Design a protein with these regions (language model features):
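Helicase P-loop NTPase motor core
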Residues: 20-33, 253-256, 262-355, 380-382, ...
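Conserved helicase core region in the C-terminal RecA-like lobe
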Residues: 78-86, 202-205, 227, 500-552, ...
Length: 661
């Protein structure tokens, strides 16, 4: 045994047929698994009779490497993923098995989405793929699957995806699982042979198993050793469920539970905070977790004015860490959703702080709404920009026919796109003046400030009406689309001229491309999902406000709390949490997780982002200037010295008053 504490040692030496090791963050679960394998081999078990299952190839490689470092003269058991094991089983029985690649599936869905909807963002493609996977992994147990996106869009993509695989004779990872279960159920000889071969099964991250993987373990099981933590179950969108751990004895009646006690990662007060937060959940084991390191770390909680001030404070703190000799890569900025990274990326580019985006394909400005608005802006600068013209000419629908656009695309003339369209024919007389007026309006955008130009596109050019029609057509919440619009407006806030903003967008894209291949020292930017299993000396959690953390689209508050818990437990020494008063110009409540963790008083006074001297716009009273902010009340002067007082929470939540500057 290698420096095991008594709880780890108990787990490693456990004689029970079926064992569940409940392993909180930083408790050394990988150490336990490696030493368990060594213990089995030292006690006469053949390596070929041991399989260790993980959820990622990198985790499997890490375990294999660590095993070899302590047992370099011993044959190595199987270390791999569930899918890797299923592949080996099926190849042995069926011969050749061809798997659809991740990139192939991604591009197939992206192409199909482009034919039926405007939203072909990375997030939307992944949502479709996740729903396809979830349907396939749950349909054996629940035939009433409801996708998280438009049912029409999902069913169309699902049909195309399955038809493509059938035509190409391809399987995906979910097919591997289903085919393996079917094979073992219907061929008892094969089942018996694998039961005799797989005498000892060890499972890492047991809480992440889906229903099919649990079924496989029950079918094949002779002796199972599972390590996991229901408090870190954050993949319900893939079919995982904390119930599998909480009710372990029901699934595996011979089961026994062992609790690892010490967190070897985080300082004492960080561990204590994480316990207070997660103890609010009901569907879990009660655990006695202690920090091995009894020293206190540094926990800070800030309520900045908005996302701009939040990103500025983070950049300043990271520079302080760097000046003290720390590496950038010792720091992570963590958020609930990818969209929240936009303001951080902007700030880091300006401050020349190197960063690495773990979700390499994300770029907020690639969302279809952003690309539409940008196309209008680009066309105002360059009226001959064909790509931008084609993108927006029917957004909203302006009755420009497919035939007219076909002729437009065929033309080799280099000229103003509106004039070219009118010269191509297939344009009805009643459309001519509308197209000419649209040309004038778009050219006039370049004479406006950026803010005015965006507002003109949204209102006068009826782009908001287009989004409402889009939401109705695809059964999507309009609020989700308006969130993108508001984030875009915030991104543009610091720019006065269109040309400067477009240059900034290009700069962001170039920096994101560089960050994909960035192996140099860089700050990590990631969603909580992306950093699960990782640890950092310094962790910043941003936008800890209700409707973001917990997210407004989630109806599972316990999973949202588990996500926050996972974020907190990534920190080794320094944890900083931010709850901006205002996001996208809207008043925000501090996250209930912050209040549960006693980081902030329930009696926090909110100023809604209002500051003395600010210009504001009231839907009722027009433009005004903030005179005073005191005890939840804002005083505003309108017109010719008309003074009015408002309850900040009321006007902010109702959206009655917005901040101009």
């Amino acid at each position: 045994m290698y420096n095991l504490d008594k709880f780890q040692s108990q787990a490693v030496k456990c004689l029970s047929k079926d064992t569940l090791v409940v392993a909180p963050p930083g408790s050394g679960k990988t150490t336990v698994i490696i030493n368990r394998v060594k213990h089995l081999i030292d006690n006469g078990v053949e390596p070929k009779n041991i399989i260790v299952l993980t959820f990622t190839k990198s985790a499997a490689e890490n375990m294999r490497s660590r095993f070899k470092s302590i047992c370099n003269n011993i044959d190595t058991p199987f270390f791999g993923t569930f899918h890797g094991l299923f592949y080996k089983i099926l190849v042995r029985y069926y011969g050749e098995v061809s798997i659809i690649s991740t990139s192939e599936a991604y591009m197939l869905i992206k192409k199909q989405l482009a034919q039926i909807t405007e939203d072909v963002s990375d997030d939307k493609v992944r949502e479709v793929l996740n729903n396809i996977s979830l349907k396939k992994t749950t349909q054996r147990y629940d035939t009433n699957f409801q996708p998280s996106l438009s049912k029409t869009i999902f069913e169309d993509c699902y049909r195309v995806y399955e038809e493509y695989k059938d035509k190409k004779r391809l399987w995906d990872f979910d097919d591997l699982q289903l085919k393996t279960i079917e094979l073992l159920e219907y061929n008892k000889n094969i089942l018996r042979s694998y039961r005799s071969l797989f005498k000892y099964i060890l499972v890492d991250e047991f809480q992440d198993c889906d229903d099919i993987q649990i079924e496989f373990l029950k079918i094949i099981n002779e002796n199972i050793f599972c390590v996991g933590d229901e408090d870190q179950c954050i993949y319900s969108f893939r079919g995982s469920n904390p119930e599998v751990m909480v009710h372990f004895e029901e699934e595996f009646p011979r089961g026994d539970k062992i609790y690892l006690k010490f967190n070897y990662r985080s300082k004492k007060n960080i561990v204590d905070l994480s316990k207070v937060i997660i103890n609010e959940n009901i569907n879990r084991y009660k655990k006695d977790i202690e920090a091995f390191d009894r020293e206190e770390g540094k926990i800070d909680f800030y309520v900045p004015y908005d996302e701009a001030e939040q990103s500025k404070k983070i950049a300043q703190k990271i520079k302080e860490y760097k000046n003290k000799g720390q590496k950038y890569q010792e720091t992570a900025v963590i958020y609930r959703t990818n969209m929240e990274s936009r303001s951080i990326i902007d700030r880091f580019i300006r401050e020349k702080i190197p960063f690495k985006l773990l979700d390499k394909d994300f770029n907020f400005f690639k969302h279809f709404i952003c690309e539409d608005i940008l196309a209008y802006l680009k066309l105002s600068i360059d009226p001959s920009d064909r790509e931008s013209f084609i993108r927006i000419i029917n957004k909203p629908f302006r009755y420009v026919s497919k035939g007219a656009l076909v002729n437009f695309r065929k033309s080799n003339k280099s000229m103003n796109c509106f004039d070219l369209l009118l010269s191509c024919g297939d344009i009805h007389p009643f459309q001519v003046k509308k197209i000419e007026d649209l040309n004038k309006d778009i050219l006039n955008l370049n004479r406006m400030t950026l803010r005015a130009a965006i507002d003109f596109i949204l209102s006068d050019l009826d782009y908001l009406d287009h989004l409402k029609d889009y939401a109705d057509k695809y059964n999507q919440e309009i609020e989700e689309l308006l969130d993108i619009v508001e984030e875009f407006k915030v991104a543009a806030k610091d720019f006065n001229k269109i040309i400067n903003f477009l240059a900034h967008i290009e700069d962001v894209e170039n920096n994101l491309k560089e960050s994909k291949n960035r192996e140099i020292d860089a700050v990590i930017l990631s969603t909580v999902h992306g950093v699960k299993g990782a640890e950092y000396k310094n962790v910043f959690i941003i936008n800890a406000v209700d409707e973001i953390f917990p997210h407004k689209n989630s109806d599972n508050i316990e999973e949202e709390r588990r996500l926050f818990y996972v974020g907190v437990t990534r920190a080794i020494e320094n944890l900083t949490i931010y709850s901006p008063k205002s996001l996208k110009g809207t008043f925000r409540e501090v996250s209930q997780f912050i209040l549960n963790g006693n980081l902030a008083s329930n009696k926090l006074e909110y100023d809604g982002g209002f500051k003395v001297g600010q210009r504001v716009l009231s839907k009722v009273n027009g433009e005004g200037t903030v005179e005073e902010v005191d005890r939840g009340v804002v005083t505003i002067i309108f017109g010719t010295n008309i003074m009015k007082r408002f309850d900040i929470k009321t006007v902010s939540k109702a959206g009655l008053i917005s901040i101009i500057d």
